[in-house]
């Protein structure tokens, strides 16, 4: 699991933000096709720009 995390984190570029479903979940986020609900904030996207990763 740690090796998987290292591979995904190195490939995704955490300094550039979350850009896919896997890194969204690793960062304790969830994907939604609308604005982030309630007090949640957008931390990236999930494959398509219109699908937001919220945390």
Curated annotation (Swiss-Prot):
Residue positions, PTM Pyrrolidone carboxylic acid: 16
One cellular-component annotation, GO: extracellular space
One term of GO molecular function: CCR6 chemokine receptor binding
Alphabetical keyword list: Antibiotic, Antimicrobial, Defensin, Disulfide bond, Pyrrolidone carboxylic acid, Secreted, Signal
Reported tissue expression: Neutrophilic granules.
Main location: secreted
Compartments, record wording: Secreted
Cysteines paired by S-S bonds: 24-53, 31-46, 36-54
Pfam families associated with the record: Defensin_beta
Record's function text: Has bactericidal activity. Active against E.coli ML35 and S.aureus 502A.
Family recorded in the similarity comment: Belongs to the beta-defensin family.
The protein's name: Beta-defensin 9
Organism encoding this protein: Bos taurus (Bovine)
